[in-house]
Swiss-Prot record:
Sites annotated Cleavage: F58, M59
Keywords assigned: Glycoprotein, Milk protein, Phosphoprotein, Secreted
Lineage: Eukaryota, Metazoa, Chordata, Craniata, Vertebrata
UniProt cross-references to PANTHER family, sorted A to Z: KAPPA CASEIN, KAPPA-CASEIN
Record's subcellular location: Secreted
Residue span of region Disordered: 100-122
Glycosylation sites: T84, T86, T89, T95, S102, T118
Residue list for modification Phosphoserine: S102, S119
Residues with PTM Phosphothreonine: T98
Protein name per its UniProtKB record: Kappa-casein
Species per Swiss-Prot/TrEMBL record: Elaphurus davidianus (Pere David's deer)
Similarity comment: Belongs to the kappa-casein family.
Length: 122
């Protein structure tokens, strides 16, 4: 296999020697009668005419695709969804009933205590 570098080819070809036709098909001769006008009275010899067959001495084979391809890094165009931390404020109400150590009956309502808690939700 021979490498063919030509300035007119976009990429190099590798030549692989080989015949397109078999040798029996290449040499095909056919006997044709001579078409000389009849005014000449001498006998005319028959002529041998060869039908032209194109013969290639080699075949041009393009290189494998992985030889002429440069490594192009793949770019991911789909943006990955990153989780954003969003602070949320929730009110937590604790209801505490206080009892005092006394014999008095307390008729007051239980105390309400409100704390603000900030949590991060992912």
């Amino acid at each position: 296999v021979a490498l063919i570098n030509n300035q007119f080819l976009p990429y190099p070809y590798y030549a692989k020697p080989g015949a397109v036709r078999s040798p029996a098909q290449i040499l095909q001769w056919q006997v044709l009668p001579n078409t000389v006008p009849a005014k000449f009275c001498q006998p005319q010899p028959t002529t041998m005419a060869r039908h032209p067959h194109p013969r290639l001495s080699f075949m041009a084979i393009p290189p494998k695709k992985n030889q002429d391809k440069t490594d192009i890094p793949s770019i991911n165009t789909i943006a990955t969804a990153e989780s954003t931390i969003t602070p949320t404020t929730e009110a937590i109400v604790d209801t505490v009933a206080t009892q005092e150590a006394s014999s008095e009956v307390i008729e007051s309502a239980p105390e309400a205590k409100t704390d603000q808690v900030t949590s991060t939700v992912v």
